[in-house]
Amino acid sequence: MQQIAKTNEQSDVLPCLVIPVQGSRLILPNVTVAEIIAFQRPNESENMPSWVLGQIEWRGTLIPVISYESYCGQKSGVMGQDIRIAVINAPNGDKGALRFFGMVVQGIPSLVKLEEPAIQENLNTSLVKGQKMAVTLETGHAIVPDLDVMEEELLAIDWQ
């Protein structure tokens, strides 16, 4: 949430996407999400962690696709007809081997423009692996996912 875009002299506004996942909502700065695409079944690979669903081709590049729920140690439920893939810009993608990865989401994200008083850290929520911070927005609760750790773990996988 560090990336604040000045829109005028009085306010700092951060355009974000609230992304529905099973049983929760994630919030990410707009610039973190490269694209939301229709779900396509990933090509499965052997010897992958259970949270890695496989790889898809996106804009001529193979990218890994993960289940956020499984990554966090939660049971991944039935994939409904509204599922999509959020293509995420890897945090260190500009200088690393992994530029993008996909995350299965449960519907269409909504755009919100956050001003600092509109978002508060929720210290009453116990965080699990994959969660950097729990926040309370004017529209409810959301989780800031830990994309840096996800990227590190994806880079450690032998894709051969």
What are these regions (language model features)?
Residues 1-160:
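An acidic, low-aromatic, low-complexity terminal/linker signal
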